[in-house]
Swiss-Prot record:
Keyword Transcription: no
Name by which UniProt lists this protein: Phospho-N-acetylmuramoyl-pentapeptide-transferase
Name of encoding gene: mraY
Pathway given in the UniProt record: Cell wall biogenesis; peptidoglycan biosynthesis
Lineage: Bacteria, Pseudomonadati, Bacteroidota, Flavobacteriia, Flavobacteriales
Top-level taxon of origin: Bacteria
Length: 409
């Protein structure tokens, strides 16, 4: 909204300083400051309000050190993250940008699913929360919306250096002119390879001519799978104070780097990566999101004054998934979201091995002392602050590795 206001003032009144709102970098800086202030100031009031409503966490007895002290800690703190992200975005971003629209829909959609889950747990006294099938239906529904929009919407394109269709001439960093064309594509990026583009449509090449017309049959299910997997991974990671918020902020910063360079024709040309028109605007959303996560971490760090609940964790996972897909970096998710992957795998391996050994030997055996992975280290006697700090360090290393793939091939 402020973007359009200052655009109007600059155009018709030549208002001093109004032109800076045209720059993504300025609006991104403003967004992170604004969201950080909102989450820290507004967050304190939300926590007090949740405490008065007695919206407290019900802790299951798992035999973990310090677990009983967490009982009654306000939950649903994800509302702080959602509000602190959306308000700066609504004020500073271009609201007619298809990527911004998708991210706003994702935030509200996944936030609603998480809120219902937390509401049922707290007010209906049902520890199971929202039934798993309904969560999956919600995640699949969002995947259908995102996948269909990214595949069919005319503003979702990539630019390649060819001389057909919509030809444009733009200046490269060295001043030379290059012929280019915006086109619809299901291409993505494969890390560590020199010619690192892969088109999902190629998976249907065996069907004969015209296979590209049916690429949506591959692309949309992949989008659904990624959104479901990453949102569940974030949900599993939210187990100890500050873990999910901190690791998510690190992952989102890495995606922010990808988004900025992929949406900038000069940087994308220099790095020889896919240029994605209109995607640079997502940097404003990412900045607001990072600020909201850091501001929330102010209250969620050990000892936590508030938990994000499924309201926050499902929203975080959904946003990260959509960002990665939109910027064509979903194949890097196992790297910059390596913590989510490890948490997910620890649960899958634990459950699968337990069932297998119970069937074969008559008693279930475990790989880890407890899953998800962070509980394994708690059982080994590590304090949760040490676990969180070390997971953050690993997350930073993974984020750096993922960014390095821009040049290392």
């Amino acid at each position: 909204m402020l973007y359009y206001l200052f655009q109007y003032l600059d155009k018709y009144f030549d208002f001093p300083g109004a032109g800076v709102f045209q720059y993504i970098t300025f609006r991104s800086a403003l967004a992170i400051i604004m969201s950080l202030l909102i989450s820290t100031i507004f967050g304190k009031r939300v926590i007090s309000y949740l405490s008065r409503l007695q919206v407290g966490e019900t802790v299951r007895e798992l035999g973990l050190e310090g677990q009983t002290q967490k009982a009654g800690t306000p939950t649903m703190g994800g509302l702080i993250i959602i509000f602190s992200t959306l308000l700066p975005v609504l004020l500073l971003a271009k609201l007619n940008n298809i990527y911004i629209i998708l991210l706003i829909v994702t935030t509200i959609w996944m936030g609603a699913i998480g809120f219902l889950d937390d509401y049922i747990k707290i007010f209906k006294k049902d520890k199971a929360g929202l039934k798993g099938i309904f969560k999956v239906i919600g995640q699949v529904g969002l995947g259908l919306i995102v996948g269909t929009t990214l595949y069919f919407h005319q503003d979702v394109t990539i630019r390649e250096n060819i001389s057909k269709n919509k030809i444009e001439v733009y200046s490269t960093q060295k001043g030379a002119n290059t012929l280019s064309s915006d086109k619809k594509s299901t291409a993505t990026t494969i890390p560590f390879f020199k010619n690192n583009e892969f088109d999902y449509a190629e998976l249907l090449a065996w069907t004969g001519d015209g296979y590209r017309n049916y690429a949506w049959l591959i692309f949309i299910p992949i989008v659904i799978f990624i959104i479901t997997a990453v949102s569940n991974g974030a949900n599993l990671t939210d187990g100890i104070d500050g873990l999910a918020a901190g690791t998510s902020a690190i992952s989102v910063i890495a995606i922010g780097v990808f988004t900025f360079v992929s949406g900038n024709v000069i940087f994308s040309n220099y790095l020889n990566i896919m240029f994605i028109p209109n995607s640079g605007e997502m940097t404003v959303f990412i900045a607001a999101f990072v600020g909201a996560l850091i501001g929330f971490l102010w209250y969620n760090s050990y000892p936590a004054a508030v938990f994000m609940g499924d309201t926050g964790s499902l929203t975080i996972g959904g946003i990260i998934a959509v960002l990665a897909i939109a910027v064509r970096k979903e194949m890097l998710i196992p790297v910059f979201c390596g913590i989510f992957l490890a948490e997910n795998l620890s649960v899958v391996l634990q459950v699968s091995y337990f069932k297998y050994t119970k069937k074969r030997f008559g008693e279930g055996r475990r790989i880890f002392l407890m899953s998800p992975l962070h509980h394994h280290y708690q059982k080994k006697g590590y304090h949760e602050s040490k676990i969180v700090t070390r997971f953050w360090i690993v997350g930073i290393l993974l984020a750096i590795v993922s960014i390095v793939t821009l040049k290392l091939r």
